[in-house]
Design a protein with these regions (language model features):
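A short, contiguous, amphipathic alpha-helix enriched in charged residues
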Residues: 1-6, 150-172, 212, 307-317
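GHKL (Bergerat-fold) ATPase N-terminal catalytic module, capturing the glycine-rich phosphate-binding loop
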Residues: 1-84, 92, 115, 316-317
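A contiguous, basic/glycine-rich beta-loop/short-helix subdomain that forms a polymer-engagement track
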Residues: 195, 206, 280, 284-318
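GHKL/Bergerat-fold ATPase module
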Residues: 61, 79-81, 102, 118-148, ...
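Conserved, well-folded catalytic cores of nucleic-acid-processing
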Residues: 2-5, 27-37, 71, 97-104, ...
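A short amphipathic beta-strand at an alpha->beta junction
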Residues: 101-113
Length: 318
């Protein structure tokens, strides 16, 4: 009934009707939900194995809220479900897929610290250590690409780029783009200062990391970049994309095409600004990626030549 009543409503909750909950059965053979409404004296337990219906019964719960308990499947020859019970495995999963969800994802973690030194300290004193548990927020929550460019330093952008894309050098250019209207998205793009070792090989994969409201849905979405800008690295986050959209659906998604076109123009304008305002840096960029721009102008029967012509450099005797 809830789904039917709110079918046409703009509900801004990730996975409200599917992926966020039903994906639990991908790793659990049973799911238990215990919930108590604020101001209520009653709590209820819902339990299902994901196949034949569910069981609903009264439960005991001291505080208001909802607990979701996953009964993780046993390991198989092909799947290691124990990874979802491993502390470091959980941290890695949260960092990869939900680092930028705007709500805190917290977990109790076991840590160690040195015990306070006695006073006075005996001559034969040796430091002692103790273990303790601490509730730690695992995700960053506020993505850097949603901040105003004036709020982020060049060093912060460079550190984010090097950490996210495993590069040792600062980017040649940082491109911040956000649009509301026909296509709603935030994008943070980087023009590398050097080409990857495999850039001109068939093994190189172009694409931008694609997020839906802070949740990673594709590590490298090739459809967001034209081939002649395949060197660009970055992230696109859109609230208009479904969390469970498939690769096939993405290729036909009109929002993705709008974002592609907007980013293409933005990248072109930023490169042209670099050429006009920092010729030395642009020439360094050209040595790394100029061949790709020339190929873009030549390929597809010169279809993109008009777009790229202002970015091309040629040797001259003058």
């Amino acid at each position: 009934d809830f789904k039917k009543d709110n079918k046409d409503e703009n509900i801004d909750i990730i996975g409200q009707f599917g992926v966020g909950f039903y994906s639990a059965f991908m790793v659990a053979d049973k799911v238990t939900v215990i919930s108590k409404a604020y101001g209520s004296d009653e709590a209820w337990q819902w339990e299902s194995s994901g196949a034949d219906g569910y069981e609903l019964e009264p439960a005991e719960k001291e505080t208001a809220g909802t607990d979701i308990i996953l009964h993780i499947k046993p390991d198989t020859e092909t799947d290691n479900y124990d990874n979802f019970l491993d502390e470091y495995g959980i941290v890695a999963i949260v960092k990869k897929y939900s680092d930028y969800v705007r709500y805190p994802i917290q977990m109790e973690r076991e840590k160690s610290r040195q015990k306070p030194e006695p006073d006075p300290k005996p001559d034969d004193y040796k430091p002692e250590w103790e273990t303790y548990t601490e509730l730690e927020t695992l995700n960053s929550m506020v993505p850097i690409w949603k901040k105003q460019k004036s709020e982020v330093t060049d060093e912060e952008y460079a550190n984010f780029y090097k950490d996210k894309f495993s590069d040792y050098a600062d980017p040649a250019r940082v491109i911040v783009s956000r649009t509301e209207g026909t296509a709603n998205y935030n994008a943070l793009l980087f023009v590398p200062s050097h080409r990857p070792y495999d850039f001109y090989t068939k093994d190189y994969e172009k694409g931008l990391a694609l997020y839906a409201s802070g949740v990673l849905i594709m590590e490298k979405c090739a459809d967001l970049l034209p081939d002649y800008f395949s060197f660009v690295k970055g992230i696109v986050d859109s609230q208009d994309l479904s969390l469970n959209i498939s690769r096939e659906m993405l290729q036909k998604d009109n929002q993705l095409k709008l974002i592609h076109n907007a980013l293409e123009k933005k990248i072109k304008n930023e490169l042209h600004a670099m050429l006009a305002n920092d010729r030395e840096k642009y020439e360094s960029f050209w040595k790394e990626f100029g061949r790709q721009l020339k190929f873009g102008a030549y390929s597809d029967y010169g279809m993109h030549a008009e777009l790229l012509r202002d970015l091309l450099l040629f040797w001259s005797a003058k």
